[in-house]
Amino acid sequence: MINDSGVAGQTIRAVMADTEAAAELTAGGYPPEELSRGLGLQKALESALAERQAADGAETAANRAYKTADKALRTTYSTVRGLSRSAFLKDPAALETLGLAGREPRDMEQIMGAVDRLLKNAPLPDYAAKLTRRGVTAAKLQGLQAKLEALQEADRVQEAAKSATPKVTAKRDAAAKVLFDWLVEFKAFARAQFKERPDILKRWGI
């Protein structure tokens, strides 16, 4: 039914333009003002449909951006982690402090926690020199930090997009109900009032 918004608009405009039936329409409770109100309901639905379409597009884009940011952080972290571990393979305490002990995490929350721990401790004097010699420079750590922040922002945008979709869907559905309730009543009146004038009903698409 929602997809019939355009057809509803065509019907209402055809009725508004039909001067031959104007007097009977007004007498039946459908003066120009009421028909204009009906057209306003149709325009409100069109606006709500556009909002829903935009929300769908925003959510799709947000999901795509999140996947890209997720992959970028995983790839960068895996490289930095491997280089960092190679500097402290015989120092379990250092590995623990830097968040490098055990297997590489796969869960994103664990990865983000491990990245945060590495970024906090890598600049400390006990670790910075060795890490730099293995290629884990300040610039490389800054790059990792940027990837982490990009993922956090992508997550925020994704959640915002997800929460927006139900709201605009409810708005669309409410607008559709108001319009089509109005249209059902109008069509019932029109069929009764103009049952002897099928040509008029045909002009209106009823």
Predicted regions and their residues:
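Basic/polar low-complexity intrinsically disordered segments
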Residues: M1-I206
